Regions:
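Sec-dependent N-terminal signal peptides
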Residues: 4-13
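N-terminal helix-cap/turn-to-beta initiation motif at the start of protein domains
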Residues: 15-29, 128-147
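Residue-level detector of conserved, well-ordered beta-strand and adjacent loop positions
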Residues: 29, 119, 149, 163, ...
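Contiguous, well-ordered beta-strand patches that form the walls/edges
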Residues: 33-42, 48-104, 152-158, 168-243
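Short, structured interface segments
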Residues: 105-137
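Surface-exposed interaction/gating patches
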Residues: 133, 137-169
Length: 244
């Protein structure tokens, strides 16, 4: 009788401590694209190699899912499909399939796109941040972070610091920068990596070339007519920076 009582307690304990439903609420970013770019590779190639989407924002309580890439935000209804699997329905305009694999959120492959893997950001998201900014801040930190020395160009010998929030110091009068991650700026750059440099609301687009620890910043020459979409081509080099 004593053995039967012990066995019953063990079975009851097992029933009360079963696996809890997994909550995937929160932000997930395309860390694979960041890791690839941070090895010193051309930025757009690194992003293209790891999928179109850059960030997922999920709220399981309201059954909403938002996905962002470099130029648009999509929002759909999150529908549980099976344990650890969900469907995102974009109001009848297509679906995405999501699956949790350990600590990664997988966006399943479709006939047009390869599968993508997303992870939780290492740094917490900034409150009320614009869509896509968590990915962008993580990319800025990994790809542009640290100290850069001006080897050639205005301010030679100066140290330049690109911050995660898009601010920059030591690069002439510029105090803001923004990397082009795709969309119109990528089309205008005709395959070249581009970034915006400016002070306040005044600035210009530049073409940059990244090879390992060296970063060339070139003038972007617009070959289009004033009433046409800009088509930028590399011009003279303005700066050569080297990561310290």
């Amino acid at each position: 009788m004593h053995k039967l009582l012990v066995l019953s307690l063990v079975l009851l304990g097992g029933c009360t401590h079963g696996p809890q439903p997994t909550d995937i609420s929160g932000l997930w970013i395309n860390q694979a694209a960041i890791d690839s770019a941070s090895q010193g590779r051309p930025l757009l190639r690194a992003i293209d190699a790891h999928g179109l989407n850059l960030e997922w924002s999920i709220d399981t309580r309201s059954n909403k899912a938002q996905v962002s890439n470099a130029f648009e935000l999509g929002e759909g209804q999150l529908q549980p499909k099976a344990p650890g699997a969900w469907t995102v329905d974009y109001n009848g305009h297509g679906t995405d399939e999501l699956q949790l694999d350990d600590n990664q959120l997988i966006q399943q492959a479709t006939k047009n796109h390869a599968a993508q893997r997303f992870t939780r950001p290492a740094q917490p998201a900034v409150a009320h941040a614009q869509w896509g900014m968590t990915f962008r801040r993580a990319l800025n930190s990994a790809y542009m972070g640290g100290q850069w020395k001006i080897i050639e160009g205005q301010g030679a010998g100066n140290i330049v610091v690109f911050n995660a929030d898009g601010s920059v110091s030591g690069l002439a009068q510029n105090n803001r920068y923004e990397l082009c991650l795709g969309g119109d700026c990528a089309t205008q750059g005709a395959g070249n990596d581009t970034l915006y440099l400016g002070k306040g609301d005044v600035g210009d687009s530049w073409i940059f070339v990244r090879y390992g620890k060296q970063l060339e910043i070139l003038q972007a020459i617009n070959q289009s007519q004033p009433d046409e979409i800009p088509q930028l081509t590399p011009g003279p080099r303005k700066w050569l920076l080297e990561k310290q």
